C-alpha cells in the first residue's frame, strides 16, 4: 500500500524503479507546508520515503521541486 497522497507533494514512480518525490508549491518556491505532525510536508516526506523503502520495485528516490526552486524552507506565513 502506498502513501496517502497530497497536492503539495507529488509521488511519481516510473517503471524503471525511479521514484520522484516533488515539492509542489512553486508559487511559494516550494516552501514547507504545515507542521512536522501528520499533515505537514516533513511528515509526508517521511511517509513517502517509508513507502519507497517498503516497495521492492523502487531502486532510487529523487527528491526535487516543481518550478525554479527546490525548497525555500519553512513557510512562515502558514
List PLM regions with ranges.
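Amphipathic alpha-helical interaction surfaces in cytosolic regulatory modules
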Residues: 68-78
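Conserved CoA-thioester-binding segment of acyl-CoA-metabolizing enzymes
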Residues: 1-66
Amino acid at each position: 500500500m502506498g502513501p496517502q497522497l497530497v497536492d503539495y507533494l507529488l509521488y511519481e514512480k516510473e517503471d524503471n524503479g525511479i521514484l520522484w518525490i516533488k515539492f509542489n508549491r512553486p508559487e511559494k518556491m516550494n516552501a514547507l507546508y504545515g507542521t512536522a505532525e501528520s499533515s505537514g510536508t516533513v511528515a509526508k516526506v517521511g511517509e513517502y520515503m517509508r513507502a519507497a523503502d517498503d516497495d521492492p520495485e523502487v531502486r532510487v528516490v529523487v527528491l526535487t521541486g516543481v518550478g525554479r526552486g527546490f525548497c525555500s524552507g519553512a513557510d512562515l506565513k502558514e
